Amino acid sequence: MKIDIVSVFPEYFEVMNLSLMGKAQAKGLLEIKAHNLRDWTHDVHHSVDDTPVGGGAGMVMKPEVWSECLDELLGFSQPSAATDAVDTSDPGDSAAPDSSAPSGAPVLIFPNPSAPLFTQRDATELSHADHLLFGCGRYEGYDARIPDYYRAQGVDVREYSIGDYVLNGGEVAVSVMLEAITRLMPGFMGNPDSIVEESYTGEGALLEHRQYTKPAVWRGIAVPDVLLSGDHGKVDRFRRDEALARTAEIRPDLIAALDCKALDKADRKTLMALGWEVSAAHPRRLAD
């Protein structure tokens, strides 16, 4: 997978040379390059921002600088003749022309706190892409016409939020998304089975059960006896029940999204004991 990152602080991404990300690059699984947006400026101050049209606080990143940068990285030889045919859909819309399995052409991704939430499903989908191009905003963000323009040129443009909070820039958000995406690539993890039971993974996703290691008793706190029983069936059931219970407490929305037909008898019993009705298409809390 080829990954290009555009930022006014490209040195931020030197951390990508560490740990599994660095090993994946050494093995040829990833090719990561961070670009300095200021390299596409032409004034003595290397300006990348200007005051907001209509007034207001802060500065907005200029479309002229971004367009020169993105045109080059996307392989556009010159501005498209479709310049005037700009898609004016909600810039927070992250839908792609074909969101089933991106590959081949680059996927252009902008972090944006006003956009849809980035999820494990998005990470899984994007892990199949051949080329990801991330744009890191700063200040009050980037001119809204930038993603609109490239959508109109047929580019698969995504805008994602990583949570209900605001950061100083897009670099942290890009790092989060990049790690979530790349670790799902075949060959990235040393043990591919380690991602199978993780939180949010697969259909009917739940929060993962809690984990323990040796010693069996630490500072007077013992691990659950069933985990020491050697009975793999009981261990699996215990972990499944704990995953259901933790999800019901912390993320009840994930329980409510489950397909009751896919639940086995033990799952149903556990959820009923936790106060959920499981006779309909999806579980429903009895207190609701």
From Swiss-Prot:
Q: What are the alphabetically sorted keywords of the record? A: Cytoplasm, Methyltransferase, S-adenosyl-L-methionine, Transferase, tRNA processing
Where in the cell does this protein reside?
Cytoplasm
EC numbers: 2.1.1.228
One MF annotation (Gene Ontology) recorded for this entry: tRNA (guanine(37)-N1)-methyltransferase activity
Q: Name one GO cellular component term.
A: cytosol
Catalytic activity line of the entry: guanosine(37) in tRNA + S-adenosyl-L-methionine = N(1)-methylguanosine(37) in tRNA + S-adenosyl-L-homocysteine + H(+)
Name the positions where S-adenosyl-L-methionine binds: G137, I162, G163, D164, Y165, V166, L167
- Where primarily located? cytoplasm
Biased composition range(s): Low complexity:
89-105
One GO-annotated biological process of the protein? tRNA N1-guanine methylation
By sequence similarity, the record places it as follows: Belongs to the RNA methyltransferase TrmD family.
- Role this protein plays: Specifically methylates guanosine-37 in various tRNAs.
Q: How does it assemble?
A: Homodimer.
Name of the protein this chain belongs to = tRNA (guanine-N(1)-)-methyltransferase
